[in-house]
Amino acid sequence: MPNFLSKILSFGADKDLKAYKRIVEKINALEPTMQAMSDEELQAQTEKFKARYAEGESLDDLLPEAFATVREASVRTIGQRHFDVQLIGGIALHKGTIAEMKTGEGKTLVSTLAGYLNALSGEGVHIVTVNDYLAKRDSEWMGTIYKFLGISVGLLQNGMRLSLKKPAYEADITYGTNSEFGFDYLRDNMVTRPEMRVQRGHHYAIVDEVDSILIDEARTPLIISGAGTKSAGTYKDFAKAVRGLIPDIDFEMDEAKHTIATTEIGLEKVERALNIDDIYNDESGQLVNHLQQALKAEYMFHRDQQYVVIDGEVKIVDEFTGRIMEGRRYSEGLHQAIEAKENVQVREENQTLATITLQNYFLMYDKLSGMTGTAMTEDAEFREVYHVPVQVIPPNRPVKREDLDDLVYRTIDAKFEAVVRDVEERHQNGQPVLVGTVSIDNSERISRILSKRGIKHNVLNAKFHEREAQIIAQAGRKGAVTIATNMAGRGTDILLGGNPDVMAEDILRNQGIEPAEATQEQKEAARKEAKEICATEREAVTAAGGLCVIGTERHESRRIDNQLRGRSGRQGDPGQTQFYLSLEDDLMRRFGGDRMDGVAAMMQRYELPDDMPIKAKIVTKLVEGAQHKVEEVNFAMRKNVLDYDDVMNKQRQVIYAERNKILDGKDLMELIETVTASTTQRVCEEFCYGDADEWDLEGLEKWLTELTGKTDLPEFTEDTKFEQLEEDVTAFVQKTFDEKTQKLGEEVMRELAAQVMLRVIDTRWMAYLQEMDYLKTGIGLRGFGQRDPLVEYKTEAYEAFTLLVNTMYEDFLRTILRLELVNRPRQNTEAEAFQNAHYSGGEETDGDQKALKQGKSMLKNAAAIGKSPQGTGASQSSVSTYRKSDDPNPYVNVGRNDPCPCGSGKKFKNCHGRNR
């Protein structure tokens, strides 16, 4: 269905392309005018464009002249002139589409066109890359063009201090990674002072390698978390309990859908091992979650595939790039479960402080566009989720690459033997070879065989990635053999004969000179030598057939296969690609189905030798069918993540909007009467609902004492009318507030009200996020009861959010009414505010903020530092009241909707507070 839909939706693409070509003709007509300008005249164009925009001209009106200006500025600064097809790509970006451009077509240069044009509005342009290296490289390289034209450029980097980020965002164009932009948005909605916010809106984003960021990363939400419960022992117990379970008897697993669950037999075994009567009787859902994560860790996540263990630490491997994702941890306890399985230190579980999916983050932009070499296969998803179509941009030169038919072997061993033979033969002929693998295991396996045969080669995987860009840049040298997991080195062109700039640095190092310390004369001499070597090798490599890309396995996504193919044949260069498959490959085994089993049986029946491959259209179709199945499953999973986050996204927008209003000076004093009336009305109805003889006046009085800290309450009897009772309670609360205001002074009270409300919002929101995490973990079980889990989730999330809002205002009143000012709150610095936060979900994370202490303490100094009459601060789980040291009642300070202090996981009103 997605492919069919994509074809229908793409019918207008050719029409758009024709329109873009007409605009290119206008740009080309302006080129002589731009060439005739002096540098000063060309630079003055920017201010003229800004003035015209301010007077009412649209960016579309300015486009031809602006693009012609950038093209000429590029020639004068970095010596590169935009091709016509690059101008088309720039127009596509400006129009809010995804430009699919083949590898080597100069996507980085294309971004300068749309970036410059949209920066003229003054609202800021975000250029998003997949890693810090590319963000820094592109900001410096393309920044030369921007700065020549008077456009400021900002750069976000992993570990950058927050004080340096504000200037970066205030620049006309800001470069950074997707996770850095996303985390900054979340952090902006956790700060306690308006000047600590760094972002200034979401006007326009250009996403480089857009498929990697908006598709591959979309299943993983961005999460800022703090330290939560300590349950390392529980993880270890469950890891032992699930070890040794028998597939299909003790548990059922669907690798295609990434699901696993115990059978009744298996559940009984686990419960016996743990000495637990009924895991599913745990109302908190935590034991069920421990079981689920232990099963996943033991049977679905494998060392050196999804993760590696380095120096006693479990590190995630990006399944699409093969890179280690430093600083990132699986959520919902899965990472701890893997640590327990691998018998390394189990780090304490984190509590979510703020979270958002990449889908919902990028949907906030007024205009979104992107660039990649492979997007058309995901056109339907881009349209459905992001409302952004894909525009295929024709290549500047025809593609000369030869894509050979797949070779399919019966066994994995036979396949790898054939791969090595092919590599050896091409290496001897001087043809460079790039071998793509899907796992670290496979890359190391091929490396071992090549080493035994004396073939020099480079390995790029999650374990060896320090000089990734340099190694991949030289993968086109004569006879070079490079083994890379998937798309390691993406974003770096492979030039036939080698990259002279990288080679020049190597020449200097071989002479004992650090490139940064070399004189200009030394640099020029090294570059001259490198250019001569590269030119000679380029001729030899071209004669040998160009770069050969060998794929050792089809990826689950055709797009990833196309990315691997795209490393060869750039800019009209010759090249070849060849995929080697086996019937034992994961893709074939998991998704091939009965027909693939039939092919295997046929090969066995005719006793075909292991080293004899088959080439048959039926096998190719089966492979494509298997990939199509996986793509549908993965799309459904990403859509599922979005469906669930959409529920919370609306709630997040409400909470963050309220926070920002307070930060921007919203006067809470004006709301006190409304908040008081709505809170007292709700509570009076809760305690005194129905007939008077069923009223819980004692409970109401306890609540009122807890709320205000006073014992001289109005007198209530069963003879009092409900309306009068509600009026008396409201008046009493309002009077208490007025007295507090008079005592502290109105200005002090106004400031404290804002700070207290921020703290209450943050505390309640964190608790709510944790509750939603547990709800999502167990909601899938509702499907067994013939109920739609998503509908159930929406219903319960709505009820929980309603309760959140109600208790939020109640907590605010409770804190403000009982608060005693002892000194002015100490203003917390940005370092204190986020030093305890932990970041997960993106490949690049904030490196100087790894400490895992008490996460909620980041809010402590930001809130009003006050004391109750007993001299203590607010509790962590809620902003509650406080028990006197001589009070024998241990529950006097516990709110009815707070977690019960006994540790059961239930709310207090459903546990020890049931009869109170």
Locate predicted features.
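Hydrophobic, well-ordered secondary-structure elements that form the walls
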Residues: 435, 483, 765, 801, ...
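Short Cys/His-rich zinc-binding micro-motifs
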Residues: 890-909, 913
